[in-house]
Amino acid sequence: RSTADDPEKFKSTVKKVAENTNLPLLLCSFNPTVLESGLMAIPKRRPLIYAATKDNWKDMAELAIMYDCPLAIFAPNDLTLLRSLVKTLTEYGVEDLVLDPGTFSSEGLADTINNFTMIRRAGCNKGDELLGYPLIGTPIVAWAESGGAPEVSAWKEAYVASMLVNRYADILIMHSTDGWVLLP
């Protein structure tokens, strides 16, 4: 995840991480310029690009097509917008998509669970192909939302992850590395 919004710093970090793992990578920034610098550092890998929004979808689509990478779509708590972005991106030519309807660990947790459930039901039970893509959840938000003791943040992250796994999340972005947090 780019925290500095600095393309050169991000490129260097991505290169260093890629040299030290064969695991799948996810490059996270809403700034297409920053993401492109990271993608240039690892031309033979296919990281998940995170994320297209209503404001940057075209630039992100260009990156996904140019580098042949999957693209996450982020539309927090707005399933109509999420579906619209999926339609727009597929018509633009992006085929590998991952959907992020937003994750909330405190206020809005019920909305998070409902959104994941409604998306999966629409995709599976109602045949809505636009909502049939994999779902990504971000329990890592517990660390930003709680602002308290690390143990409390880790606990919140663990229960949000458990709920999302039970409600159809295919990918989770976690902060904690403690075994008890990763059990879900």
Annotate the PLM regions.
Residues 55-184:
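Catalytic alpha/beta core domains of metabolic enzymes, predominantly
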Residues 1-83:
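Active-site beta->alpha loop and helix N-cap motifs at the rims of alpha/beta catalytic domains
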